Amino acid sequence: MNSTLQHGMHTSLHFWNRSTYGQHSNATESLGKGYPDGGCYEQLFVSPEVFVTLGVISLLENILVIVAIAKNKNLHSPMYFFICSLAVADMLVSVSNGSETIVITLLNSTDTDAQSFTVNIDNVIDSVICSSLLASICSLLSIAVDRYFTIFYALQYHNIMTVRRVGIIISCIWAACTVSGILFIIYSDSTAVIICLITMFFTMLALMASLYVHMFLMARLHIKRIAVLPGTGTIRQGANMKGAITLTILIGVFVVCWAPFFLHLIFYISCPQNPYCVCFMSHFNLYLILIMCNSIIDPLIYALRSQELRKTFKEIICCYPLGGLCDLSSRY
């Protein structure tokens, strides 16, 4: 995204930056001259086609997730509604990054008069990406809270997490994240905004980690207590723990894919002139690729961890021209 993160493309300053596709800032140039491996300070080039391709793949995958959850009534549960919210956020992040690649290409090829309009479009895209990032974090936290309730408040769960209440929670998440994302971009020239975003990221991770430490420490004891009750409490608790493990994988992938970007922000505000920090920040395009990969990996995790969702995926795909492949696979 367009920012002054040591190698920004635009003269306007924003904290989210898409680099200059092979060029670098004056500050980076001066740092590179003083070191024998000055090439480290060259902004890593990634072909625009890569961003567009990843955006299209993410779009198709996450639309499949959303349609599957809407189609299958067995998936109409709080956890899957929150997963649907996460899928929307993932889709917007990747599609917006892909769209921004096109905007940047236009910005480089248009005249000065048209560039101001293109920059405004890019600012809108930045706001969408920032809002989607916040929505992703909040959706993951919501899934963690939902798993916590299913394990420790199993008997009261359906009274606590009603469909109406879940709908209100998701609506509030997106409303708050949209407003926050817009404000972050408007005031992105301020270092305080970057610090606020970094703080939110690590605070949410700390909250989720706290929930999981408590969940996995107490889960076995709680399962034993539920097991003495009539019905299928043990089976239900086993399914709930499977959902908790799925979320653990999702959070792990999220951290791996987003951590380099937030480390980039930390370096930007703490050591922008340090040669090692500049070298790390020169790989910003790679960190954007990781972010887009997160949006592609998440639907694969859903499919691998949920037999019901996997079954629905197959039903949807078989309704289209690819149905012949489904018939062929069912014969062998």
UniProtKB/Swiss-Prot annotation:
Membrane-spanning ranges: 44-69, 82-106, 124-145, 166-186, 192-215, 249-271, 281-304
Classification via Pfam families: 7tm_1
Lipid-modified sites (S-palmitoyl cysteine): C318
UniProt KW Lipoprotein keyword: yes
A molecular function GO annotation: melanocortin receptor activity
UniProt-annotated binding residues for Ca(2+): E100, D122, D126
Alphabetized UniProt keyword annotations: Calcium, Cell membrane, Disulfide bond, G-protein coupled receptor, Glycoprotein, Lipoprotein, Membrane, Metal-binding, Palmitate, Receptor, Transducer, Transmembrane, Transmembrane helix
Glycosylation sites: N2, N17, N26
Family: Belongs to the G-protein coupled receptor 1 family.
Oligomer and partners: Homodimer; disulfide-linked, also forms higher order oligomers. Interacts with GNAS. Interacts with ATRNL1. Interacts with MGRN1; this interaction competes with GNAS-binding and thus inhibits agonist-induced cAMP production. Interacts with MRAP and MRAP2; these associated factors increase ligand-sensitivity and generation of cAMP.
Function: Hormone receptor that acts as a key component of the leptin-melanocortin pathway at the intersection of homeostatic maintenance of energetic state. Plays a role in regulating food intake: activation by a stimulating hormone such as anorexigenic alpha-melanocyte stimulating hormone (alpha-MSH) inhibits appetite, whereas binding to a natural antagonist like Agouti-related protein/AGRP promotes appetite. G-protein-coupled receptor that activates conventional Galphas signaling leading to induction of anorexogenic signaling in the hypothalamus to result in negative energy balance.
UniProt name for this protein: Melanocortin receptor 4
Lineage: Eukaryota, Metazoa, Chordata, Craniata, Vertebrata
Chain's gene name: MC4R
